[in-house]
Amino acid sequence: MRLLLLLLVAASAMVRSEASANLGGVPSKRLKMQYATGPLLKFQICVSUGYRRVFEEYMRVISQRYPDIRIEGENYLPQPIYRHIASFLSVFKLVLIGLIIVGKDPFAFFGMQAPSIWQWGQENKVYACMMVFFLSNMIENQCMSTGAFEITLNDVPVWSKLESGHLPSMQQLVQILDNEMKLNVHMDSIPHHRS
């Protein structure tokens, strides 16, 4: 029982330190283009969906074409309920794997008879631990995936994958940026009259 308690405390401490360093899959540092002084182009992406490479490619092309634009990228967080479910599952997964390895029957603690799947897990510990690990990870990833690829220029939305349903092509993004930059230059050239 002490070993189980120690395992639970260690798992909880590990999850807390991981959560403070990496909140819900958010990279601990933002992806930024330093030294640029112009407008801010901000990408909010679903890192767990594999959009990081797309962002890096877009960032490379945009920084070559528009050297004055500052580019930032960050993880688009899912709703808090999904983040909490994923955090709970990560702790529960470790506790369950610990119980399987140690061989303690948690159902006896509640005065219940162990189900047949628990007995199977005790007879096949390696397979049971792998199954718990992979199924839990699959559900955690599903909870943390948003599918987002949101782009803003100076906090004005210019593209939303959540609304459009697809990623912008490089040509679309360059055309949007060209139009926005021309509009900004045009607006800056209009004299402001005071009343």
Curated annotation (Swiss-Prot):
UniProt record, GO biological process: cell redox homeostasis; cellular oxidant detoxification; glucose homeostasis; insulin secretion involved in cellular response to glucose stimulus; pancreas development; positive regulation of cytosolic calcium ion concentration; positive regulation of growth hormone secretion; response to glucose
Keyword Acyltransferase listed: no
Listed Gene3D superfamilies: Glutaredoxin
Cystines in this chain: none
Record membrane topology: Single-pass membrane protein
Post-translational modifications: May contain a selenide-sulfide bond between Cys-46 and Sec-49. This bond is speculated to serve as redox-active pair.
Record keywords, A-Z: Endoplasmic reticulum, Membrane, NADP, Oxidoreductase, Redox-active center, Selenocysteine, Signal, Transmembrane, Transmembrane helix
Cysteinyl-selenocysteine (Cys-Sec) cross-link, chain position(s): C46-U49
EC number: 1.8.1.9
Pfam families: Rdx (PF10262)
UniProt-listed SUPFAM superfamilies: Thioredoxin-like
The keyword Transmembrane belongs to this UniProt entry's keyword annotation: yes
Induction: Induced by Parkinson disease-inducing neurotoxins such as 1-methyl-4-phenyl-1,2,3,6-tetrahydropyridine (MPTP).
Range of residues in the leader sequence: 1-19
Result for mutant: U49S: Increases ROS levels induced by neurotoxins
GO cellular component: endoplasmic reticulum; endoplasmic reticulum membrane
Expression by tissue: Ubiquitous. Highly expressed in the endocrine pancreas.
Role this protein plays: Selenoprotein with thioredoxin reductase-like oxidoreductase activity. Protects dopaminergic neurons against oxidative stress and cell death. Involved in ADCYAP1/PACAP-induced calcium mobilization and neuroendocrine secretion. Plays a role in fibroblast anchorage and redox regulation. In gastric smooth muscle, modulates the contraction processes through the regulation of calcium release and MYLK activation. In pancreatic islets, involved in the control of glucose homeostasis, contributes to prolonged ADCYAP1/PACAP-induced insulin secretion.
UniProt family annotation: Belongs to the SelWTH family. Selenoprotein T subfamily.
Clinical note on disease: mRNA levels are increased more than 200-folds in the caudate putamen from Parkinson disease (PD) patients compared to control subjects. In conditional brain knockout mice, treatment with PD-inducing neurotoxins provoke rapid and severe parkinsonian-like motor defects.
Protein name: Thioredoxin reductase-like selenoprotein T
Organism: Homo sapiens (Human)
